[in-house]
Amino acid sequence: MHVNGKVALVTGAAQGIGKAFTEALLLHGAKVALVDWNLETGVKCKAALDEQFEPQKTLFIQCDVADQKQLRDTFRKVVDHFGRLDILVNNAGVNNEKNWEQTLQINLVSVISGTYLGLDYMSKQNGGEGGIIINISSIAGLMPVAQQPVYCASKHGIIGFTRSAAMAANLMKSGVRLNVICPGFVKTPILESIEKEENMGQYIEYTDQIKAMMKFYGILDPSAIANGLINLIEDDALNGAIMKITASKGIHFQDYDLFPSFSKAP
């Protein structure tokens, strides 16, 4: 799929990786709906983008992705405004081991909800024109992390759900591809949360160990993750792919044993 001329919806779009995604999509000719819970940051992001791109290329919508009604209304507003939806990036996420239920709600449940909403609008079965959904997990979704067990569980869940949903979308001939990006450590505000007790709870004593891991693995710039996003969108052969992006290896993919390719019975 070529990005130029397409309509994208990005959650958690006002800062960090989400902002980098938005900028990359705009640079490649897409129109982008910026979805974020932070009104002030979202308005500032939209204003900054308006100085570089035509204002009509972007739409900012304040939304708490954990609120199902707000999320449904957001998708409707985007399609009403731009007339279509081609690219969905479920990027919003938090790191909070203390309020672990909220972490699961934002990191996993909202991704599942967003994916199903995206399929409702994009699937050819529903009169859509197909498209692509990219869910943002983490390297923590592929390994155990003693200091962040709930965050780790949420990111594992994204991978299992997306791979399964990708198989289902293919069986249903929906015309929608689903893929995952698993970044390593990225220079974003979420990294600052590892030093806050209100985020880490009982695991705050392991902050130095996390910092040592960051030093060992290196820290990526958000633009590196945005490059991976564009690659996933433009490679039509990728469905159910797990793209890993690390400072040491750059973009590479997780290998899995192949499952049988079941097709619908005639």
Swiss-Prot record:
InterPro entries: NAD(P)-bd_dom_sf, Sc_DH/Rdtase_CS, SDR_fam. NAD(+) binds at residues 12-20, 36-37, 63-65, 91, 151-155, 186-188. This is 15-hydroxyprostaglandin dehydrogenase [NAD(+)]. Belongs to the short-chain dehydrogenases/reductases (SDR) family. The lineage of its organism: Eukaryota, Metazoa, Chordata, Craniata, Vertebrata. Keywords: Cytoplasm, Fatty acid metabolism, Lipid metabolism, NAD, Oxidoreductase, Prostaglandin metabolism, Tumor suppressor. GO terms for cellular component: basolateral plasma membrane; cytoplasm; cytosol; extracellular space; nucleoplasm. It is found in: Cytoplasm. Homodimer. Its EC number is 1.1.1.141, 1.1.1.-, 1.1.1.232. It comes from Rattus norvegicus. CDD domains: ADH_SDR_c_like (cd05323). Substrate binds at S138, Q148. Its main location: cytoplasm. One of its GO terms (molecular function) is 15-hydroxyprostaglandin dehydrogenase (NAD+) activity. It is an enzyme of class 1 (oxidoreductase). The active site is at Y151 (proton acceptor). It catalyses: prostaglandin E2 + NAD(+) = 15-oxoprostaglandin E2 + NADH + H(+); (15S)-hydroxy-(5Z,8Z,11Z,13E)-eicosatetraenoate + NAD(+) = 15-oxo-(5Z,8Z,11Z,13E)-eicosatetraenoate + NADH + H(+); (11R)-hydroxy-(5Z,8Z,12E,14Z)-eicosatetraenoate + NAD(+) = 11-oxo-(5Z,8Z,12E,14Z)-eicosatetraenoate + NADH + H(+); lipoxin A4 + NAD(+) = 15-oxo-(5S,6R)-dihydroxy-(7E,9E,11Z,13E)-eicosatetraenoate + NADH + H(+). Catalyzes the NAD-dependent dehydrogenation (oxidation) of a broad array of hydroxylated polyunsaturated fatty acids (mainly eicosanoids and docosanoids, including prostaglandins, lipoxins and resolvins), yielding their corresponding keto (oxo) metabolites. Decreases the levels of the pro-proliferative prostaglandins such as prostaglandin E2 (whose activity is increased in cancer because of an increase in the expression of cyclooxygenase 2) and generates oxo-fatty acid products that can profoundly influence cell function by abrogating pro-inflammatory cytokine expression. One of its GO terms (biological process) is regulation of prostaglandin catabolic process.
